[in-house]
Amino acid sequence: MNWFSRFLDFISPRLCVVCGRRLSPTERSLCSVCQLHLPRTAFQFTPQDNPMAQLFWHLAPIERAAAFIYYQPHSEMARMVYRLKYRNSPDVGEDLGRLMATDFLLAHYFDDIDLLLPVPLTRKRQHQRGYNQSEMLARGISDVTHLPVAAKALKRQVFRESQTHLSRHERQENVDGIFVVTDTEILKGRHVLLIDDICTTGATLTACAKALASIEGIRISVLTLGFTKN
């Protein structure tokens, strides 16, 4: 941290997005204590057969699936995700992406991945928010893995109602057919890693995978920040 950053930190201290404790000069978004106590899933060690991967069985051609942490509404982790999505904090997404990537490299999760493909927002929603939180996660992952981010290869063409209070079947109906591929050439013959913030029923990621599945030679895997533990 340079002198100007230290000065800014003095007049406007950086706080942990989970516990609110003041961060040290070497900490980013999360303090070391909260990083240590994140409810990690360890799904990356069994990427073909874990509770998240099982959501896609017989529904989408997804090779491996994993989430970094378990997510519960109204928890400390939910506060972190809320900050990422709704409090104009793209830097939190990048920091979490770096943290995810560092953990997942140990399990060789990124082996043979060619591209990071963030799940897109609609143009209206991205304009309202100022950024796509999934893209910020992907940018952070890219900083560690040096994998390219294909942020414009997939488009969300319509916005339907929020998924928050819908059943699994309603969620699937809500997202069916809403994603379209805008750059087929960059995806041909590639192993793409779909990046999203939270996986609850897998409906959004399934819809993305279905939109991608017809591309020649494509392989699809997924990685999310959180997985809702039912």
Please state what every model-predicted region is.
Residues 1-195, 200-230:
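Glycine-rich phosphate/pyrophosphate-handling loop used in enzymes and phosphotransfer proteins
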